[in-house]
């Protein structure tokens, strides 16, 4: 679950959001989602992807956008439930250890924020791991199932 807060600003733009899976030492395992203006003419929405700096440096610059099953449209303020059907195959290949889901948001004429949600793999039971952003992101809850 991902909460995008409504900000009281003169010029509001929906944030671009990227979520990915990484090891405890911050090596990218795979991308979960990239939400941006996918329908802008001449792929103009891709211009701002680099504003999600951590994601861009670690993974984004090497991707040919849009990525099937990963790319999607920006979301309005509110709470959203995102599912990652490809994550199961990704997780099944991982050795036991500490991992984290990383969520980064950036807005045109706005700020940027990154939230890390740590978890142990493999799971012994279903888990719901909460985290909270301060400005660009609200509550982030990662629900994991074995």
For each feature predicted by the language model, list its residue ranges.
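Beta-strand elements of well-folded, non-transmembrane domains
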Residues: 4-6, 23, 88-90, 105-109
